[in-house]
């Protein structure tokens, strides 16, 4: 009951309003505010009133402008970078090593036989189109050549270049390896290009190269990709270099290790790669002390004599340092170690800590990235490299209907090959050169908020020396093959020393350049400096704004009611009827004394007594008027709120 009464009083108070007009409210505010200036506007003479009004208006505008600048600066989410140094025992990084050649030529030669013969014929026609000493003629399988051939472009007349096919004598899918007919261009006057055509052959593009070496290497790699994509990965692993052949010796600190301490993964570019201290199944190994004596020492046998001649032109080992449980993108971030040398790598650690939303677009674990991570099968952490490659593979599947061999294969998809997807090379070339595709993937992928980078200082020296070369190679050969029949040579061994230079690590951390404390202090400082105000002054100003809105709403409601009343008066002309008029409109004429009512003939019932006729009508109260139902009378306690 009390709550209902209290709510009713509150409703009456809302309907009544502040009880001031606009002018009275402004005068009250100027007299009572703690802000300097408004009080002088109403207390001084006319000239000073105008002066103080202009000054107050100017400084108010200046404060609002400064507030806008500070708020815009705060909403720009700028960061400041701090660099700090630390010293502690650190976990040794994961080390990935690969051979520069992905496969042993002795094991893949049967797959590349036709391609190698075609490659030799291509080189003959490029290098000696008219003066070849090849007397024997052999038949070549040019089925793969028909999909992506190499051509010579004669640009002696730049306005009308001439395209010459290297195998102009192709008939029924085969070609002779003898030189082609004399051409009007030589190797100095022509450029080698790769012709890529769509499925029906109506649209063709030419990928130009500045050197014939680049052209034939890219062409051979494209054809080899087509071949290896049709071989099961289990067989490819067997054709690559096994760990027991690649890793001859291993030492971590003072503890010996072997190839069994490495985790094997298959990389499409480098075949079998081996990761030390990956941390997938065991705890990461710490480094006891900085210095070369407490790092990882490896001796590798790259087996250069068994390299694929046209697939790999670089000899050595490829290695990369990375975090535990992260996938090694060794093609993009790795370095080469040259054969016949001892490569020493000193490591310094940088830790990056980025601010997340809204300061940057980084992600903690990649769960908020709208790209399917194709490297999740390796159970590795998120990285922007994995995201970009997964995004490219998705676009490859959408545009070319097949997946590229160099990237993980999604479930239910197939790798591209010439037999099932004849125009995949044309589609892949366009997609790889597409700027829109790269921008799409870069915008969709995010950097990792926390990252560790390993800065390397690399030095090299010949190893072994001429004085110790014989006995070292004999000992290594005996340890590897348990016999001295096979002797290693300088061109096939690589020695690596990987160690921490020092235990000092750098932490590069982002922090908010402008936080909420900075914003409030600057807003308050500007307001206090220019107008002598504080937070209470803002509350006072907010109060008067609420009162202004309150009065405006009451006036609008009253105006709406007056419009409704005017419409009602226009519909029913004249004053409303009185109670007496309403009663007369419904009078029962049986009660009227001056109206004779027909009755029975007196002669019929002579002895019947005649009763008086009741004719007293209700009184006519002309003073009673009908009251509108929507009018609510305020009680005497309405102002008590």
From Swiss-Prot:
Originally identified and characterized by its inhibition by the diuretic drug amiloride. The chain crosses the membrane at residues 51-71, 534-554. The keyword Transmembrane applies. GO terms for molecular function: ligand-gated sodium channel activity. InterPro entries: ENaC, ENaC_chordates, ENaC_CS. The modification Phosphoserine is found at residues 634, 636. The keyword Disulfide bond applies. Residues 1-50, 555-641 are cytoplasmic. It catalyses: Na(+)(in) = Na(+)(out). It is a multi-pass membrane protein. GO terms for biological process: multicellular organismal-level water homeostasis; sodium ion homeostasis; sodium ion transmembrane transport. Component of the heterotrimeric epithelial sodium channel (ENaC) composed of an alpha/SCNN1A, a beta/SCNN1B and a gamma/SCNN1G subunit. An additional delta/SCNN1D subunit can replace the alpha/SCNN1A subunit to form an alternative channel with specific properties. Interacts with WWP1 (via WW domains). Interacts with WWP2 (via WW domains); inhibits the channel. Interacts with the full-length immature form of PCSK9 (pro-PCSK9). Interacts (N-glycosylated) with BPIFA1; the interaction is direct and inhibits the proteolytic processing of SCNN1A and SCNN1G and the activation of ENaC. This is one of the three pore-forming subunits of the heterotrimeric epithelial sodium channel (ENaC), a critical regulator of sodium balance and fluid homeostasis. ENaC operates in epithelial tissues, where it mediates the electrodiffusion of sodium ions from extracellular fluid through the apical membrane of cells, with water following osmotically. It plays a key role in maintaining sodium homeostasis through electrogenic sodium reabsorption in the kidneys. Additionally, ENaC is essential for airway surface liquid homeostasis, which is crucial for proper mucus clearance. This is Epithelial sodium channel subunit beta. It comes from Canis lupus familiaris (Dog).
């Amino acid at each position: 009951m009390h709550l209902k009464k209290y709510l009713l009083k509150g409703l009456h108070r809302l309907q009544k309003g502040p009880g001031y007009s606009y002018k009275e409210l402004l005068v009250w505010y100027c007299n009572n505010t703690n802000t300097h200036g408004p009080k002088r506007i109403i207390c001084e003479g006319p000239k000073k009133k105008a002066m103080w009004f202009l000054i107050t208006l100017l400084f108010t505008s200046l404060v609002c402008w400064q507030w806008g600048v500070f708020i815009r600066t705060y909403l720009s989410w700028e960061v400041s970078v701090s660099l700090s140094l630390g010293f502690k025992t650190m976990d040794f990084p994961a080390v990935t090593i690969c051979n520069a050649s992905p496969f042993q030529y002795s094991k893949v030669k049967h797959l590349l036989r036709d391609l190698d013969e075609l490659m030799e014929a291509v080189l003959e026609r490029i290098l000696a189109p008219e003066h070849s000493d090849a007397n024997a003629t052999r038949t070549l399988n040019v089925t793969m050549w028909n999909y992506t051939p190499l051509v010579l472009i004669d640009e002696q007349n730049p306005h009308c270049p001439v395209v010459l096919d290297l195998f102009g004598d192709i008939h029924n899918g085969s070609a002779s390896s003898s030189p082609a007919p004399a051409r009007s261009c030589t190797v100095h006057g022509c450029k080698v290009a790769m012709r890529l055509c769509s499925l029906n052959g109506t649209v063709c593009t030419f990928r130009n190269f500045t050197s014939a070496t680049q052209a034939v290497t890219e062409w051979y790699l494209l054809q080899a990709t087509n071949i290896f994509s049709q071989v099961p990965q289990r067989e490819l692993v067997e054709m690559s270099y096994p760990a027991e052949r690649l890793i001859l010796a291993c030492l971590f600190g003072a503890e010996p290790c072997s190839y069994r301490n490495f985790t094997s993964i298959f990389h499409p570019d480098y075949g079998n790669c081996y990761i030390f201290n990956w941390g997938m199944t065991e705890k990461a190994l710490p480094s006891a002390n900085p210095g070369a004596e407490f790092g990882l020492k490896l001796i590798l046998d790259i087996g250069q004599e068994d390299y694929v001649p046209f697939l790999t032109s670089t000899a050595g080992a490829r290695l990369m340092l990375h975090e535990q449980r992260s996938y090694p993108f060794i093609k993009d971030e790795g370095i080469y170690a040259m054969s016949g040398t001892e490569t020493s790598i000193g490591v310094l650690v940088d830790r990056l800590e980025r601010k997340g939303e809204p300061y940057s677009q980084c992600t903690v674990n990649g769960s908020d990235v709208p790209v399917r991570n194709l490297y999740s099968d390796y159970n590795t952490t998120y990285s922007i490299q994995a995201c970009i490659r997964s995004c490219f593979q998705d676009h490859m599947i959408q545009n070319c209907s097949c997946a590229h061999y160099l990237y993980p294969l999604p479930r239910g998809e197939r790798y591209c090959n010439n037999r099932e997807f004849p125009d995949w090379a044309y589609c892949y070339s366009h997609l790889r050169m597409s700027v829109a595709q790269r921008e799409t993937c870069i915008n969709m992928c995010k950097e990792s908020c926390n990252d560790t980078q390993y800065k390397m200082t690399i030095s090299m020296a010949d190893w072994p020396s001429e004085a110790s070369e014989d006995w070292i190679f004999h000992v290594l050969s005996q340890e590897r093959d348990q016999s001295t029949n096979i002797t290693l040579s300088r061109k096939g061994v690589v020695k690596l020393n990987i160690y921490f230079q020092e235990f000092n690590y750098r932490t590069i951390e982002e922090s908010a350049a402008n936080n909420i404390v900075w914003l409030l202090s600057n807003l308050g400082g500007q307001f206090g400096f220019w107008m002598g105000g504080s937070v209470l002054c803002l509350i006072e100003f907010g109060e008067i704004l609420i009162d202004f809105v309150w009065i405006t709403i009451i006036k609008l409601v009253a105006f709406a009611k007056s419009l409704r009343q005017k419409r009602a008066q226009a519909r029913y002309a004249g004053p409303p009827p009185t109670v007496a008029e309403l009663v007369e409109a419904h009078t029962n004429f049986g009660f009227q004394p001056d109206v004779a009512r027909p009755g029975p003939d007196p002669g019929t019932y002579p002895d019947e007594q005649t009763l008086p006729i009741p004719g007293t009508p209700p009184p006519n109260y002309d003073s009673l008027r009908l009251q509108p139902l929507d009018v609510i009378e305020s009680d005497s306690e309405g102002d008590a709120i």
